[in-house]
């Protein structure tokens, strides 16, 4: 029997441009879902009771101890949806975000030194790691990064980004991968499904501006993805989405509401005891610089979802991190006429031609042209082996042409417009 935790709380971490403060609307979303399907309330209670029974049966003598069980490794595919070249974040940015996730879940980040002394005894190495996939659903080689240019300027929280039919990108099989979509969400920082939702919607959506280390004030260290990954693994907000609510974790103090900004010292609410609120927990909405721990209780709750009968269990036998069975190479009849792309004529007056017959893997990628000042001028989608671009409207001068591919290959050419 397969036990499901249905996606009832899509967690919206909303960052106001005016106040630079994240505000969550998950409670309103939950109320609407329960109104649409009242029977879900009973179903949630039954499933949560099963989780609590499972947790009781596990060893709880873990406080303050390093992780000693097997490390869970989660295959990740990152879908990058971009409308402009500036939104097409680099592979390095993706690697950076994966590093932040691993440091946070393994308690290896340097800012763990900022955890208050009175909470250090329950601060957990969760024994969970994230790795970019090496095999795609067809067992072909992959970098674990998908790039797709889209006509959509800004996405909402309606999950359209998760469907190619809506100009988004279809999810890879969620029984084998964690899907992360990166796109322009406007003022929204990110949101996540909970375990057990529809497989085609399962995963995390992160705003381009807060993915990896960025310039977004207050949320520039990649912690938004850490927060949303916590939701994806079954954690609630630390204040339980209501005044002094329940997050279903025993060792997190009761808290009156989310925490704004980056406080310090002891802040007490809900009779949280002499140590006060745990506003430095990743499941609060504190700014990135002030979040630095998951607790032992949160660790155990996340890891129980990988046990038999729970939806994340299939990830333990995923083929996503196995060596690919198929390594794609161009068919014989499409082998290159030469060993590198050709750009001609150069100089040019009204049209340039980029011949990419040397490698069909450039199909579907985007050509970007900038001027000598680095300003973006124009772009064109590669939909044939030979691409012609009209440059009649360009001012005379030197220009740079760039095409990037998921595997790190890059075409860089320069040309002169007469």
Question: Where are the model-predicted features located?
Answer:
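Short hydrophobic "helix-edge" motifs at membrane interfaces and signal-peptide entry regions
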Residues: 5, 33-41, 217-218, 335-337
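Primarily auto-inhibitory N-terminal propeptides
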Residues: 20-100, 104
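Extracellular (secreted or membrane-anchored) zinc-dependent metallopeptidases
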Residues: 76-86, 91-136, 147-226, 232-334
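C-terminal outer-membrane/trafficking sorting elements
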Residues: 336-344, 348-418
């Amino acid at each position: 029997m397969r036990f499901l935790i249905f996606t009832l709380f899509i967690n919206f971490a909303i960052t106001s441009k005016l106040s630079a403060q994240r505000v969550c609307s998950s409670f309103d979303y939950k109320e609407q879902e329960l109104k649409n399907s009242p029977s879900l309330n009973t179903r949630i209670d039954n499933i949560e009771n099963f989780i609590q029974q499972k947790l009781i049966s596990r060893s709880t003598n873990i406080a303050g101890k390093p992780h000693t069980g097997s490390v869970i490794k989660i295959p990740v595919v990152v879908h990058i949806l971009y409308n402009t070249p500036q939104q097409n974040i680099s592979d390095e940015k993706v690697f950076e975000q994966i590093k932040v996730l691993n440091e946070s879940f393994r308690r290896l980040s340097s800012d763990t030194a900022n955890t208050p002394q009175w909470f250090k005894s329950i601060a957990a190495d969760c024994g969970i790691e994230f790795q970019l996939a090496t095999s795609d659903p067809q067992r072909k080689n992959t970098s674990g990064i998908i790039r797709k240019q889209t006509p959509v300027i800004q996405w909402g929280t309606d999950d359209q980004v998760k469907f190619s039919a809506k100009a988004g990108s279809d999810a890879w099989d969620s029984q084998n991968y964690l899907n992360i979509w990166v796109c322009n969400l406007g003022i929204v920082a990110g949101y996540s499904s909970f375990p057990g939702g529809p497989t085609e919607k399962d995963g995390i959506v992160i705003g381009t501006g807060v993915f990896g280390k960025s310039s977004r004030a207050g949320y520039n260290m990649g912690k938004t993805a850490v927060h949303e990954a916590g939701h994806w693994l079954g954690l609630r907000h630390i204040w339980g989405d209501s005044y002094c609510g329940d997050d279903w974790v025993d060792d997190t103090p009761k808290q009156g509401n989310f925490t704004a900004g980056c406080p310090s010292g002891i802040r007490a609410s809900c009779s949280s005891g002499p140590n006060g609120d745990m506003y430095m927990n990743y499941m609060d909405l504190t700014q990135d610089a002030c979040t630095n721990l998951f607790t032992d209780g949160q660790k155990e709750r996340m890891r129980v979802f990988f046990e038999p009968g729970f939806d994340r269990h299939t990830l333990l036998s995923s083929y996503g991190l196995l060596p690919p069975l198929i390594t794609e190479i161009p068919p014989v009849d499409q082998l290159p006429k030469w060993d590198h792309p050709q750009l001609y004529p150069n100089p040019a007056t009204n049209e340039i031609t980029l011949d990419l017959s040397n490698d069909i893997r450039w199909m579907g990628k985007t050509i970007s042209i900038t001027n000598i000042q680095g300003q973006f001028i124009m772009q064109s989608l590669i939909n044939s082996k030979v691409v012609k671009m009209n440059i009649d409207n360009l001012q005379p001068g030197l220009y740079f042409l760039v095409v990037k591919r998921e595997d790190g290959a890059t075409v860089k050419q320069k040309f002169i417009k007469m």
